[in-house]
């Protein structure tokens, strides 16, 4: 069942554009806090098309990575450019990396929003495909599949889940 769900999510987004982090779509203003299986983040909408944030990711083999990032809405909030700086990348030739990428989100359907992201840094690449669900009163649920590919070492991939609160 999970394999079919993951395949369906990838198929829905693959036709839009080539496809990691959970792509949240903030309203015109606000702050979003989230915690997931492998990460915690906080982000804020600072301009109508720009969001900045901080993310802490727990990597099995590579320690706890910190990222400071920004997203820029290119086409509404459905296509976003992603960029940032990540540190504490263990076992790499350098422990820091600037990165950039793209995020694509489909329109909401019955409170569900599929998305996919791809980011590439000088020492890693990461993809994520997932599904956001708006529960109520600013609360949301996220289910995703991520694939973290370091320059040196083994890939880390798996299914994750998380909750988000927008205020």
What are these regions (language model features)?
Residues 55-63, 86-92, 117-126, 146-152:
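Sequence/structural signature of outer-membrane beta-barrel proteins
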Residues 39-43, 67-69, 99-101, 128, ...:
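Membrane-embedded beta-strand positions in outer-membrane beta-barrel channels/transporters
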Residues 48-54, 75-83, 107-114, 135-143:
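Repeated loop/turn-to-beta-strand initiation elements of outer-membrane beta-barrel proteins
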Residues 19-67:
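Short glycine/proline- and aromatic-enriched beta-strand/turn motifs that initiate or cap beta-hairpins
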Residues 44-46, 72-74, 87, 102-108, ...:
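Residue-level signature of outer-membrane beta-barrel architecture
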Residues 154-167:
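Outer-membrane beta-barrel "beta-signal"
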Residues 1-30:
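Cleavable N-terminal export/targeting peptides
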Residues 28-36, 53-57, 82-86, 115-119, ...:
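Transmembrane beta-strands of outer-membrane beta-barrel proteins
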């Amino acid at each position: 069942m999970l394999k079919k769900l993951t395949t369906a999510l990838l198929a829905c987004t693959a036709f839009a554009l080539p496809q990691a982090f959970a792509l949240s779509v903030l309203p015109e203003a606000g702050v979003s806090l989230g915690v997931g299986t492998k990460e915690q983040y906080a982000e804020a909408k600072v301009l109508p098309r720009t969001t900045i944030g901080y993310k802490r990711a727990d990597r099995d083999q590579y320690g706890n990575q910190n990222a400071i990032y920004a997203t820029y809405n290119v086409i509404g909030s459905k296509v976003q450019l992603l960029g940032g700086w990540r540190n504490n990348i263990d076992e790499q030739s350098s422990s820091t990396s600037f990165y950039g990428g793209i995020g694509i989100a489909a329109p909401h359907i019955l409170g569900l929003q599929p998305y996919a992201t791809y980011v590439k840094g000088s020492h890693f690449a990461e993809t994520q495909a997932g599904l956001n669900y708006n529960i109520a009163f600013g609360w949301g649920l996220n289910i995703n599949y991520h694939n973290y590919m370091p320059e040196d070492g083994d890939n880390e991939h798996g299914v994750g889940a998380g909750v988000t609160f927008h205020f």
